[in-house]
Amino acid sequence: METVFDINEIMKILPHRYPFLLVDRIVEHVPGERIVGIKNVTINEPFFQGHFPGHPIMPGVLIVEAMAQVGGILAYMASDDEVRNKVCYFASIDNVKFRKPVLPGDQLRIEVAATGCKRGIWCFSAKAIVKGKVTTQAELKATFADKDRL
């Protein structure tokens, strides 16, 4: 699997840092259309200490956050220089479905497709996949804003 953006390039785009940076690399990117990110889920993730002891499962909200981060990279890369000085914020989540748990040792493949952009609001369709099976799917919206505006 070829790496399009490595972790260093991702950290130049996203403001998130450990333990909240939830994408390790980008392996596919069609500018303004779609993107695929990878998150390697290890037992060392801090959330596994409490979710759940003896039966670790990646929290669904963090899977959705990983989708949003990958979508944010897609929107950022398709935007002009003015937007690149701003931060991409989550605007909404719709039609989320959790189909299968994500466990330590899984490699999460996050596929995000842009479905539109109106008045600065990006719309995405996203899927998280492990071993070829969809674990989570959602429709997301995001927008860019000045860091000090919110």
Curated annotation (Swiss-Prot):
One GO cellular component term noted in the UniProt record for this chain: membrane
GO BP: fatty acid biosynthetic process; lipid A biosynthetic process
EC number of the protein: 4.2.1.59
Catalytic residues, chain numbering: H51
Keywords: Cytoplasm, Lipid A biosynthesis, Lipid biosynthesis, Lipid metabolism, Lyase
GO terms, molecular function: (3R)-hydroxyacyl-[acyl-carrier-protein] dehydratase activity
InterPro entries: FabA_FabZ, FabZ, HotDog_dom_sf
Highest taxon above the source species: Bacteria
Chief location of this protein within or outside the cell: cytoplasm
EC category name: lyase
Localization of this protein: Cytoplasm
CDD domains attached to this UniProt entry: FabZ
Reactions performed catalytically: a (3R)-hydroxyacyl-[ACP] = a (2E)-enoyl-[ACP] + H2O
Xref: HAMAP family: FabZ
Purpose of the protein: Involved in unsaturated fatty acids biosynthesis. Catalyzes the dehydration of short chain beta-hydroxyacyl-ACPs and long chain saturated and unsaturated beta-hydroxyacyl-ACPs.
NCBIfam families: fabZ, PRK00006.1
Family: Belongs to the thioester dehydratase family. FabZ subfamily.
Name of the protein in its database record: 3-hydroxyacyl-[acyl-carrier-protein] dehydratase FabZ
The encoding gene: fabZ
